[in-house]
């Protein structure tokens, strides 16, 4: 009988990536297959996020639902991972004694041993340690699921922004070696992946070891990834302005595989608030980065994170944020009302902005961003956009869907053989959350890099002399 695994994931793309690795790992070691139905599962894993308000209560609410499944079948194993697990540790079992496994983001690779221990001893396992980058050496080869893929290049963060729990839950910055990253991406490319998104809490802080023992920069890594056959688009998230150096900007100037879209969080337009947040950069320094980026790549579009209602934020501070939003002309944002995360310095600050004022500021900010995003979309009307076709449209099974370089979803009529390939689409309609277009050019007509295997080249060029000896002419 097939053993089944159910994983519920909350939070960032790093968590999504980690969950996919858990599934691959447990299929390899224990033969588990994924199921969307918790009631069918032999193992239930909750991959948690501690960024949002009331994260802990959300976890215990979900565990309460799973408790009934455990009562019906005591052999079901329940595990809690992710940042809440890292933050709370044994306290989770204080409130939920039926939880069998508690593991952190850096110990998910030990899940097979933890499961075996629970089955063998019927005793719980807690491992929320921070072994340096060990998990990547223990995970199976990557498996592609479509033409896009996420690849984690580093873990943790050293910035210690006053509102953020990441350094406490994922540890300090540790970079994967460049060879490991390039190998993983090459394996994905061999399975048909065309676009890769490099992941890290502070991705441009990557300083990984090269094959010769030297230390590479993030700009070096971007160029290495761009040279991999089959990879035609590169994205990365998330960046920090303080380490967005000129050598990265130069990659935008000379590397077309790097998309014309960047998520670069600023959080606030007020230097006073930025200082209280521990951001170590000013609004002017942020604008200088954007100015240099647009000199290197004039069509680049920028998105950001914003926190409104941070302790001590005045109306004038908020107006400076709105001024920055207009000056940079952000295309998109992830914006939130401040809520204190336990254990962070900001949790000890006086939360003196009234809740209604926070909500009003958030509404004003999001409305402005939405207006700017719509203006960006309208500029695309009548233009030709290169789309990576991801699959069937959510709006109609008779249509295909894909994304532009600037992360717009485009729906269009096409044939199934286009999935996983690029098409050029003329934008004919603009909607708030998507675009519509018509195909004007397929990948075969684009003249993209031709990727051939060594075997096909040898087969095509093999010759034999009069003695029957094979010779090869490239």
From Swiss-Prot:
It is an enzyme of class 2 (transferase). It catalyses: N(6)-dimethylallyladenosine(37) in tRNA + (sulfur carrier)-SH + AH2 + 2 S-adenosyl-L-methionine = 2-methylsulfanyl-N(6)-dimethylallyladenosine(37) in tRNA + (sulfur carrier)-H + 5'-deoxyadenosine + L-methionine + A + S-adenosyl-L-homocysteine + 2 H(+). [4Fe-4S] cluster 2 binds at residues 157, 161, 164. It comes from the Bacteria. Binds 2 [4Fe-4S] clusters. One cluster is coordinated with 3 cysteines and an exchangeable S-adenosyl-L-methionine. The keyword Ligase does not apply. Its EC number is 2.8.4.3. It is found in: Cytoplasm. Keywords: 4Fe-4S, Cytoplasm, Iron, Iron-sulfur, Metal-binding, S-adenosyl-L-methionine, Transferase, tRNA processing. It holds the Pfam family TRAM. The keyword Protein biosynthesis does not apply. InterPro entries: Elp3/MiaA/NifB-like_rSAM, Methylthiotransferase, Methylthiotransferase_CS, Methylthiotransferase_N, Methylthiotransferase_N_sf, MiaB_methiolase, rSAM, rSAM_horseshoe. SUPFAM superfamilies: Radical SAM enzymes (SSF102114). Gene3D superfamilies: Methylthiotransferase, N-terminal domain, tm_1862 like domain. Disulfide bonds: none annotated. Its cofactor is [4Fe-4S] cluster. Residues 378-441 form the TRAM domain. Catalyzes the methylthiolation of N6-(dimethylallyl)adenosine (i(6)A), leading to the formation of 2-methylthio-N6-(dimethylallyl)adenosine (ms(2)i(6)A) at position 37 in tRNAs that read codons beginning with uridine. NCBIfam families: miaB-methiolase, MiaB/RimO family radical SAM methylthiotransferase. Belongs to the methylthiotransferase family. MiaB subfamily. Monomer. This is tRNA-2-methylthio-N(6)-dimethylallyladenosine synthase. It comes from Cronobacter sakazakii (strain ATCC BAA-894). The lineage of its organism: Bacteria, Pseudomonadati, Pseudomonadota, Gammaproteobacteria, Enterobacterales. The gene is miaB.
């Amino acid at each position: 009988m097939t053993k089944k695994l159910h994983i519920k994931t909350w939070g960032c793309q790093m968590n999504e990536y980690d969950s996919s690795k858990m599934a691959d790992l447990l299929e390899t070691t224990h033969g588990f297959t994924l199921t969307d139905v918790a009631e069918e599962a032999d193992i239930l894993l909750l991959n948690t996020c501690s960024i949002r308000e009331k994260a802990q209560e959300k976890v215990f609410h979900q565990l309460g639902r799973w408790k009934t499944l455990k009562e019906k079948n005591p052999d079901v194993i329940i595990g809690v991972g992710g940042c809440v697990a890292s933050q709370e540790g044994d306290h989770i079992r204080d409130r939920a004694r039926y939880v069998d496994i508690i593991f952190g983001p850096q110990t998910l690779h030990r899940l097979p041993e933890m499961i075996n221990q629970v089955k063998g001893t019927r005793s719980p396992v807690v491992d929320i340690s921070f072994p340096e980058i060990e998990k990547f050496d223990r995970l199976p080869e990557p498996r592609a699921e479509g033409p896009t893929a996420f690849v984690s290049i580093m873990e943790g963060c050293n910035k210690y922004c006053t509102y953020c729990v990441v350094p406490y839950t994922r540890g300090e910055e540790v970079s994967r070696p460049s060879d490991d990253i390039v190998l993983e991406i090459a394996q994905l490319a061999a399975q048909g992946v065309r676009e890769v998104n490099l992941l890290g809490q502070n991705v441009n802080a990557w300083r990984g070891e090269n094959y010769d023992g030297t230390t590479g920069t993030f700009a070096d890594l971007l160029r290495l990834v761009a040279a991999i056959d089959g990879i035609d688009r590169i994205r990365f998230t998330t960046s920090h302005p303080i380490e967005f150096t000129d050598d990265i900007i130069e990659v935008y100037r000379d590397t077309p595989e790097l998309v014309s879209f960047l998520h670069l969080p600023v959080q606030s337009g007020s230097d006073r608030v930025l200082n209280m947040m521990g951001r170590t950069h000013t609004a002017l320094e942020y604008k200088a980065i954007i100015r240099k980026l647009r000199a290197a790549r004039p069509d680049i579009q920028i998105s950001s994170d914003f926190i409104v209602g941070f302790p001590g934020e005045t109306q004038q501070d908020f107006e400076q944020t709105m001024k920055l939003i207009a000056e940079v002309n952000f295309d998109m944002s992830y914006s939130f009302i401040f809520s204190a995360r336990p254990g962070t310095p900001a949790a000890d600050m006086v939360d003196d902005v009234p809740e209604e004022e926070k909500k009003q500021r958030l509404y004003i900010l999001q409305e402005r961003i939405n207006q700017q995003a719509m203006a960006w979309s309208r500029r695309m009307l009548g233009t030709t956009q290169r789309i990576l076709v991801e699959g069937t449209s959510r709006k109609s099974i008779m249509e295909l869907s894909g994304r532009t370089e600037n992360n717009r979803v485009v729906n269009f009529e096409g044939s199934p053989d286009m999935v996983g390939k690029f098409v050029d689409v003329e934008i004919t309609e603009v909607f708030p959350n998507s675009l519509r277009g018509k195909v004007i050019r397929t990948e075969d007509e684009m003249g993209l890099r031709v990727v051939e295997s060594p075997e096909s080249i040898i087969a095509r060029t093999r010759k034999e002399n009069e003695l029957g000896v094979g010779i090869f002419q490239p």
